[in-house]
Curated annotation (Swiss-Prot):
Name listed for the protein in its UniProt record: Beta-ketoacyl-[acyl-carrier-protein] synthase III
CDD domains in UniProt: KAS_III
Role, per record: Catalyzes the condensation reaction of fatty acid synthesis by the addition to an acyl acceptor of two carbons from malonyl-ACP. Catalyzes the first condensation reaction which initiates fatty acid synthesis and may therefore play a role in governing the total rate of fatty acid production. Possesses both acetoacetyl-ACP synthase and acetyl transacylase activities. Its substrate specificity determines the biosynthesis of branched-chain and/or straight-chain of fatty acids.
Lineage: Bacteria, Pseudomonadati, Pseudomonadota, Alphaproteobacteria, Hyphomicrobiales
Organism: Rhizobium johnstonii (strain DSM 114642 / LMG 32736 / 3841)
Known EC number: 2.3.1.180
Length: 323
């Protein structure tokens, strides 16, 4: 049985760091308020010379170096983003070009904060279907470009960055002991689209628009949706929270992360937290967290790892893999 095994990982962050103290100078907020409600202490903000594609390229090159590969070894590039450099061509094609690739194929996935989970699931399907041997999966965002910096309820939450992994086709035994992606579960419900959205677009306003969010409404649904899809991943593989080595959640809000882990009886020591350092980087948050925890040695070969996210739409999903 073909499995999609993680061959390499990487991350990239903008040069500029904005702390909560910096945010106090922009809007009516405080470090105490932000930390208490979100767990965020700082975030990275892209400069004029940094774009979604440039950050994605840097993360991709880091993943290639980590995996001992070159761009010539990649068959497919998938980039999850809601903040593309252009309406078209796709950011993935831009990154492909930046990497010097003129072979293979590339496309973007847009599922907001769940984008990386969708992208990993898509890459796994291409690998298992025999259409690609190695897939570069990137989550890259510059959410600072779509924030209303006068809206204190949203501008303090988001940051910029990129993360990447390389999935490689590897022969497995077809059991949960295999390395690689074991199962994936994706969901969406468009009836919630007005709770988290951007108030612009090419075919409606002809503008980029700004992010708008009904924070309390999103919070109300988040824990239930996240835990349901994680449980589905456990059930489909015959595993439990006790078997899990690491939960790598979308880094949106510390209270949502803690609430989800508690509901599923997942030990807090097994949860990777980077929201304090990066803020909510949408589709980039999970690969950034993966790169952090794998880079410092916490996530090791053979570990059972759960990825989960929820985003605008609503979209939500989970991927269970063995590192």
């Amino acid at each position: 049985m073909i499995r999609s095994v993680v061959r390499g990982f990487g991350a990239a962050l903008p040069k500029r760091v904005m702390t909560n103290r910096d945010m106090e100078a922009i809007v009516d907020t405080s470090d105490e308020w932000i930390v208490q409600r979100t767990g965020i202490r700082q975030r990275y903000v892209a400069g004029d010379d940094e774009t979604t594609a440039s950050l994605g390229e840097a993360a991709a090159r880091a993943a290639l170096a980590n995996g001992g590969l070159t761009p010539a070894d990649i068959d497919l590039v998938i980039c999850a983003t809601s903040t593309p450099d252009n309406t078209f061509p796709a950011t993935s094609v831009n990154i492909q070009n930046r990497l010097g690739m003129s072979h293979g194929f590339a496309f973007d996935v847009q599922a907001v904060c769940t984008g990386f989970v969708y992208a990993v699931t898509t890459a796994d399907a291409y690998i298992r279907g025999g259409l690609a041997k190695r897939v570069l999966v990137i989550g890259a965002e510059t959410f600072s470009r779509i924030l209303d910096w006068n809206d204190r309820t949203t501008c303090v939450l988001f940051g910029d960055g990129a993360g990447a992994i390389i999935l490689e086709a590897t022969e497995g035994e077809g059991t949960v002991a295999d390395r690689g992606v074991l199962t994936a579960h994706l969901r969406s419900d468009g009836s919630h689209k007005e709770k988290l959205y951007v108030d612009g677009g090419p075919s409606t306003t002809g503008t980029v628009g700004k992010l708008r969010m009904e924070g309390r409404e999103v919070f109300k649904y988040a824990v239930g949706m996240i835990t349901d899809v994680i449980q589905a991943a456990f059930d489909s593989t015959g595993t439990t929270a006790d078997d899990l080595d690491w939960l790598v959640p979308h880094q949106a809000n510390r209270r949502i992360i803690d609430g989800s882990a508690k509901k599923l009886n997942i030990d807090a020591a097994k949860v990777v937290i980077t929201v304090d350092l990066h803020g909510n980087t949408s589709a980039a948050s999970i690969p950034l967290a993966l790169a952090t925890a794998a880079g410092d040695g916490r996530i090791k070969k053979g570990d059972l790892v759960m990825l989960e996210a929820m985003g605008g739409g609503f979209t939500w999903g989970a991927v269970l893999l063995r590192w």
